[in-house]
Amino acid sequence: MPELLNPAPVAHLRHLLRAHSPLVHCMTNDVVQTFTANVLLAVGASPAMVIDPREAAQFAAIADALLINVGTLTEDRAVAMRAAVEHARQAGKPWTLDPVAVGALTVRTAFCHELLALQPAAIRGNASEILALAGMSAGGRGVDTTDTAAAALPAAQALARRLATVVAVTGEVDYVTDGERVLSVAGGNPLMTRVVGTGCALSAVVAASAALPGDRLENVAAACGLMKQAGAIAARQGGPGSFIPAFLDALYQEVQG
């Protein structure tokens, strides 16, 4: 039975982000790079977008955490991502997988399954992506989910147990599990789905949280809670055009205020 996330882990995550300011190596998609960087800065982390295959592996060992987001995957980018993950592992740095549109497209599906053998510290995806990654579904409609997070929870638990990782399946309610414990995170606002990049940016905050000390399950769930709280505040502006700056302001005020 999922346990509702209480406010204490979110408050603790705010403190940890301020205290540690983790450097997050974001190998993310072209559509969301600026927004992702701004979200990380707003929560007190430090972003870097190093993608060249000649540099990515070296930087992965320097950063505190690595994010792999396959949204705009290319052959060269896959080479760089694979090398970065391998070097992050060798350096003992946690890496997070965002399996964008897995199941819907064959190349990225095969690539993400290959990366699973390299032990991600956390996985963050929508319901259809998590179901596909666990081998329980063919995937959603491109980057959009066709399933509910609750329906994908058994797949998330199975994936977490198999890989000894933390899996966050996000939607109207987010579920975060290590295979045994399950935390549910309510809140947010539907406007979060009407702008590009909130899920991808969440994955970056998850990556940052995975690098922090303490209970990784609670840290990842708190990252989801932090984003949902900011989304609910920003939605008071009334539309997607004003949502993004209000969202960044809300995140900053939550963590730094």
Curated annotation (Swiss-Prot):
It comes from the Bacteria. Belongs to the Thz kinase family. It catalyses: 5-(2-hydroxyethyl)-4-methylthiazole + ATP = 4-methyl-5-(2-phosphooxyethyl)-thiazole + ADP + H(+). ATP binds at R124, T170. The gene is thiM. It comes from Klebsiella pneumoniae subsp. pneumoniae (strain ATCC 700721 / MGH 78578). One of its GO terms (biological process) is thiamine biosynthetic process. Substrate binds at M49, G197. Catalyzes the phosphorylation of the hydroxyl group of 4-methyl-5-beta-hydroxyethylthiazole (THZ). Gene3D superfamilies: 3.40.1190.20. This is Hydroxyethylthiazole kinase.
